[in-house]
Amino acid sequence: MNNFASNDPLVIAGTVYSSRLLTGTGKFKDLDETRLATEAAGSQIVTVAIRRVNIGQDPHQPNLLNVLSPDRYAILPNTAGCYTAEDAVRTCRLARELLDGHRLTKLEVLGDKKTLYPDVVQTLKAAEQLVAEDFQVMVYTSDDPILAKRLEEIGCVAVMPLAAPIGSGLGVQNRYNLLEIIENAQVPIIVDAGVGTASDAAIAMELGCDAVLMNTAIAGARDPVLMASAMRKAVEAGREAFLAGRIPRKRYAAASSPVEGLVG
């Protein structure tokens, strides 16, 4: 942990993290590449699709936990692939059993297979049920400020609005909505989905997001390990720029050199 990270930690559900880059574990060519990219990203929280990745469900298949140990990483099970609140809740219960009572979970309930936008009605329903069952819910949602606040009020420990559709690589498409969500939030706001390259991650952090979660942008790159390293630096730079405070935008030039005492 560097000095800057130790003085500016990310806190989720009372747990302190020095890294603000969360990474997924899907789409890599093999578990070794997953491990190398995760290490290069410097991530402390890694998300796992319970319906797609083996963490003990199948004893005859390679187990992700053998390369990404829960002793080193916070394993964040997610409900990717769920289209109803009932399926999502059932998946979270399975994850808790597989991870020995693990409470932190990433909720996502999708609306359709084309856009992979969240079904906000089903998301709210599932969030209420999971919070009632004492899960610590980090929730994937749209960039609707009203919905984001409602999810916070339900008891979600982090709200994760999309920057753009999952896997699209389009970057932040609606800065205004993200700013509204950030300014009104009392829990961490983590951009989830849509990042394509390092500048996208930096922009999200410059806006004031607390962290960024990504998978495809790293796993789908020509060199996933190198891209993971780039994303790590982008998130750190974006956070520092946010804290430093950018200069205001102006229509006209403003000289950077003093005009007093000019010769001639």
From Swiss-Prot:
Pathway: Cofactor biosynthesis; thiamine diphosphate biosynthesis
GO annotation terms (biological process): thiamine diphosphate biosynthetic process
Active-site residue list: 106 (schiff-base intermediate with dxp)
One Gene Ontology term, aspect cellular component: cytoplasm
Pfam families noted in UniProt: ThiG (PF05690)
UniProt-listed Enzyme Commission number(s): 2.8.1.10
GO MF term set: thiazole synthase activity
Binding-site list for 1-deoxy-D-xylulose 5-phosphate: 167, 193-194, 215-216
Top-rank taxon: Bacteria
Protein's UniProt keywords contain Cytoplasm: yes
CDD domains named among the record's database cross-references: ThiG
Subcellular location: Cytoplasm
Catalytic activities: [ThiS sulfur-carrier protein]-C-terminal-Gly-aminoethanethioate + 2-iminoacetate + 1-deoxy-D-xylulose 5-phosphate = [ThiS sulfur-carrier protein]-C-terminal Gly-Gly + 2-[(2R,5Z)-2-carboxy-4-methylthiazol-5(2H)-ylidene]ethyl phosphate + 2 H2O + H(+)
The keyword Transferase is annotated on this UniProt entry: yes
Keyword entries, A-Z: Cytoplasm, Schiff base, Thiamine biosynthesis, Transferase
Family: Belongs to the ThiG family.
Role, per record: Catalyzes the rearrangement of 1-deoxy-D-xylulose 5-phosphate (DXP) to produce the thiazole phosphate moiety of thiamine. Sulfur is provided by the thiocarboxylate moiety of the carrier protein ThiS. In vitro, sulfur can be provided by H(2)S.
Subunit structure: Homotetramer. Forms heterodimers with either ThiH or ThiS.
Protein name: Thiazole synthase
Gene: thiG
